[in-house]
Amino acid sequence: MLNTICIYDYGTGNYSSVENALKKLGRKVLISNHMDILKKSDGIIFPGVGSFPTAMNSINKKKIKNQLIRLIKNKKPILGICLGMQILTECSEEISFSKGLSIIPGEIKYNISKKTNIGWKKIHFISSKSKYHSLNNEYFYFLHSLSYKGPIKYQKAITKKTFE
């Protein structure tokens, strides 16, 4: 069981929401961007809210990008929430081109229409073997203008509605 979870602090994010949820689950929560604390934690959460360039600039300024990548590749459990998932990819075109951590192949691109996708849409799981397949054809709320573009094996669910 993951008892001590570190929420990565890149200077922006929904820390308090994530922290409160983890505490309700009985987990010890740390918020940090120091490698010694990240290494000692049982898992790392990269929170959402903020911009890709801001998050990556924070990681690059700390000069820990390579150490962070090694830690993740050595099987440290991680969870990326929204922006946190995005920085795990190779790059993003949000605001300006920025390189990510390259843990997940692919990139974050603006939606074709460049309009924000807002609203309730049905989600379709690509594999019927997904542990979340019972949620197939259920509605989820979306609010984004960027999407992940990468190998199909990293895409677990899609929405088929176009952006209006």
Residue ranges and their predicted role:
Residues 29-40:
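Short acidic low-complexity segments
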Residues 50-119:
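Cysteine-nucleophile active-site neighborhood
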